[in-house]
Amino acid sequence: MNWFFKKKKEELEHTNDLHKEYIELSYEQPQVLFKHSHKCGTSTWVLREFKQMLDSVDCSFDFVLINVFDKRSLSNELARVLEIPHQSPQVLVLKNGKVVDHASHGDILQLNVTQLLC
């Protein structure tokens, strides 16, 4: 599993390019996009539990943590392009250029990540 947290500010200037990058990378391996609010207790709790779930997955994928306060434009652009209304916390699983599943809040912990990613 590859973990991507924050990219350098200059790499994030072109939000359109960044969301396209994640979609393109999903053709190589699944992309797990986690929209997180560090100011929300529920988001922090779900992120911690979800990371534990991902640790048990035995296949290759990228995990991208998107801080919705710092990267609001990226979050909004993903919602627009993927046609999934913005939530936080929210997980979007991309494979082959498409969203294969998504969930928000406590429903994130109900995702069958092994089936989705492997």
Where are these regions (language model features)?
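N-terminal leader/targeting and pre-domain segments
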Residues: M1-P30
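Short cysteine/histidine-rich metal-coordination sites, predominantly Zn2+-binding motifs
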Residues: D55-F61, N112-V113
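Non-catalytic, surface beta->alpha helical segment in thiol-disulfide oxidoreductase systems
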Residues: Q87, L92-C118
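Short, basic/aromatic recognition patches
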Residues: N76-R80
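Thiol-based oxidoreductase modules, predominantly thioredoxin-like and allied folds used
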Residues: K35, C59-S75
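Short loop/turn motifs at secondary-structure junctions and domain boundaries
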Residues: L82-P85
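Local sequence-structure signature of Cys/Sec-based thiol-disulfide redox active-site neighborhoods
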Residues: E21-V57
